Amino acid sequence: MKNLCKISDDYLNSKLKYLKLLSKQYPSISKASTEIINLEAILNLPKGTEHFITDVHGEYEPFVHVLKNGSGVIKRKIEELFSNTIRDSEKKMLATLVYYPEQKLDLIIKQEENIDDFYRINIYRLIELCKYASSKYTRSKVRKLLPENFKYIIEELLHEHVKSEHKEEYYKSIVETIVDIGIAKEFIIAISTVIQKLVVDRLHVIGDIYDRGPRPDIIVDKLIEHHCVDIQWGNHDILWMGAASGEKTCIANALRISARYANLDIVEDIYGINLLPLATFAIEMYKDDPCKEFIPKVNDQSVTTTEKSLMAKMHKAISIIQFKLEGEVIRRRPEFEMEHRLLLNMINYDEGTINLKGKTYKLKDTYLPTIDKKDPYKLTMEERNVIDKLVSSFRGSEKLQKHVSFLFSKGSIYLKANSNLLIHGCVPLNEDGSFMSMNIMGKEYKGKALMDKMESLAREGFFFKDKAEEKLYGMDIMWYLWTGKCSSLFGKDDMTTFERYFIAEKETHKENKNPYFKLRENEMACKRLFEEFDLELDESHIINGHVPVESKNGESPIKANGKILVIDGGFSRAYQKTTGIAGYTLIYNSRTLQLVSHEPFNSAEEAIANESDILSTTVVVEHKAKRKMVRDTDEGIKIQEEIEDLKLLLMAYKKGLIKEM
């Protein structure tokens, strides 16, 4: 901060235009002075709690539960506050009440003989818990989180500190009135929601909201409602973002994955995308084809044989369209260096074989009626009609456009937050640890610059409406971010989708991870990454998701002596056999950095009825002897800049350069 005594009149005059604008907000010396005092006080509060979650993969129930319980933070605060004063069964009930207030109260009302007594006891407990959770925040910050209909009442109850007979009677009368006039249920729901918000100051979602899970839309809706959230895009997110932009290969990939996991409901029922043209085409083209390799992976017994058969045909139809469309992009963008993924022209259609890397393999499925062996990447007129209609549907889906707009507004490829670097996948590296480079529009990019450029192009692909060439390039980059070797979201050399469908030999299915994933075990390699992103070696961490941590095989989520933390591990049920757990989350408060591992979550219904919580184990990765204050955070830097501006405004008032209003 500049020494204000040494500020010259010339410097002050150079800032005058901005200071005059600031004076509209603080029109007097007293108002500017009061704001400086308030901001200085905020700087000396403990930093808020940050919550890190990654790789949700559409599994909305465990995600919503972890969001509600703050990865165990609420349960911990209940234990700290009521340790020996209430029974364990009451603590469990209170925690469930905070997580699911409306549903839990519906059950309790049916069971409880004296519901008014229950209301009184638990309103007092919830007020104490809310006080405890809000203790490190300013009144104004807490006020912003309060619901309008109960704002005054909750504020009065939270800030009851004067112990006098009259005051105690006053607060008791508030609680009695809440119960007597029949709004106790609504009040408990309101204050429980406030507690959920207070325990986590900021939520970081490090990618892959979308994938095979049933309801990514619920997850996005919850994030839209969240008071403070940021998102680092995952490869599955960018796929849907590209699809919403109208990028045909992204649309085909998104539909293929949805069909593969019998999850087309999200496409048709939730996002309102018309799949009839695809279904009609698939039935006509593959009428007598069992599409054995394309039967959806589904455990739901309610899916009929007829439905599976239709989905298999749609799955095959969109897969072939995808391979053709990808060929178009690869040939259009030689700088993507993906010519080796042009596989349709490597097929011997007469013999039903394919030649890969000098070796011939038998195809598992040779019924390919829409492929012209002389021009295998050419879409038939019917296929072109199907994809054109799908583009129109994806672009016209109001809900999808709203969700993807939110992902762009709150999201990025990476984020620097309070000395931590958040990236879903990796920073693309070569074997020797140097940054992998890519030519984009005639210029080489690598490291941070490459990630910045790709993000900028992706935004152009979505937002540009009238610049056709720029929009097309941006859309192609979104597909590349899904599948390209220099993509920080994908982090592999190849995506062997074709091989997995058509070739039995698993040697062809292999996808080699970027060297980053091996080198991130090395502290020296981390040092280079920290330098690239201007991070302090002693204070910083890189936080990744993307690759499941195989805990059951002894793999640790803590890499490079604690410099890198990997918090993917199994929100998706499909990965839980590999990981042995149901994922990691991370909690970063003013004193500690805590890694939390979770056991599988059954259902919200069971959690409400049986007061069962996700079993979680917490490991303290770091413990600071000195508490981290707001002053030490990114927000603190902004506040200090604001204070400096206000002090300049004070000087301008005192020198008469700006008149008080």
UniProtKB/Swiss-Prot annotation:
Pathway annotation from the record: Carbohydrate biosynthesis; gluconeogenesis
Transport as UniProt keyword: no
Known cofactor(s): Mn(2+)
EC number: 3.1.3.11
InterPro entries recorded: FBPtase_class3, Metallo-depent_PP-like
Gene3D superfamilies the UniProt entry points to: 3.60.21.10
GO molecular function: fructose 1,6-bisphosphate 1-phosphatase activity
A Pfam family per the record: FBPase_2
Keywords: Carbohydrate metabolism, Hydrolase, Manganese
A single BP term in Gene Ontology: gluconeogenesis
The keyword Calcium appears for this protein: no
Known catalytic reactions: beta-D-fructose 1,6-bisphosphate + H2O = beta-D-fructose 6-phosphate + phosphate
Coiled coil start-end: none
Family the UniProt entry places it in: Belongs to the FBPase class 3 family.
Protein name: Fructose-1,6-bisphosphatase class 3
Organism: Clostridioides difficile (strain 630) (Peptoclostridium difficile)
Lineage: Bacteria, Bacillati, Bacillota, Clostridia, Peptostreptococcales
